[in-house]
Amino acid sequence: MPQSLGNLFILAAPSGAGKSSLIKALLQNHDATEIHNNEMQVSVSHTTRAPRPGEIDGVHYHFVSRKVFQELITQDEFFEWAEVFGNYYGTSKVVIEQTLRKGIDVFLDIDWQGARQVKAQIPDTATIFVAPPSREELMRRLTERGQDTPEVIQDRMNKAVSEISHYHEFDYIVVNDDFTAALAELDAIVSSRRLRKEKQVMRHQSLFENLLASD
């Protein structure tokens, strides 16, 4: 993909690590709505699962049938796609590329498999792994929701351990023990990516041309 002003970020984490809360708080700190503003936004994925109460098509997800999803796969419309808990999820190529060209940072909320697929296609992607502070705390967070059976909780715990085993594949690691500290670390990562030479030259090209102009 051609160089773009916007930055692509991937956040991956086991269920219960607090990844979604961190993304939401980061965008709110930058005067965003829950999912987007003029400088950063969360990618809206396609999925075959049914909408949950309060979810809006095109805002939280693009809800499609399995048949439509399979057609999009055949047409090579996704950067990455995966089956999670019996449902398909995918990230649209066109939407991501158009958003980055506008200079808007994009956050992908995907697992390690998706991160690997996207990184292979866009090496400049910043991958961030959000980890819980301990195994005990992770189990507590999974249990306190009060929505799942012990079997479901154990299944999520097993999948969490599998996700954590790939932490070494990521560029950055944020341990979400103290939420405020974890949010500050995430914000620092975003700032550092924006301040890289390549991005600053694109952003301030006219400035440097003026500074270096002959009298």
From Swiss-Prot:
Alphabetical keyword list: ATP-binding, Cytoplasm, Kinase, Nucleotide-binding, Transferase
Catalytic class of the enzyme: transferase
PROSITE patterns for this protein: GUANYLATE_KINASE_1 (PS00856), GUANYLATE_KINASE_2 (PS50052)
Subcellular location: Cytoplasm
Catalytic activity, EC: 2.7.4.8
Superkingdom: Bacteria
Gene Ontology cellular component terms for the protein in this record: cytosol
HAMAP family according to UniProt: Guanylate_kinase
Protein name: Guanylate kinase
